Amino acid sequence: MLTQNYLKLLSVDGVNRFCSKPYGFELLILLYDFTKNNDEYGIEETFEMIHYNKCKRPAFLSFIKDLEAEGIIFRIQSKVKKSRSLLRLNQDTIDEIDLKNSSDEL
């Protein structure tokens, strides 16, 4: 069942792009939670939260720029600290992930 759920998630355009990197799925989970909960974690804090298969900071920032260019994620300014940029998944990706997860419950 877990394999089927994972394959369903990979059918979401944004999700399969995240999974092109060894740390991508963990990053996806973090950004999903940050977006849903409106958490105030900046880019550097997000990088530090990745525990498995972590890359070097320049490679991470390059991947973030690629995801932004593809419209999968975007940056917003923190309301708490103006110098902090927050990463968010786009709403279409969130909706597709939620749809895939809710179809499992049926």
Predicted features and spans:
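Minor-groove-contacting beta-hairpin "wing" of winged helix-turn-helix DNA-binding domains
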Residues: 80-89
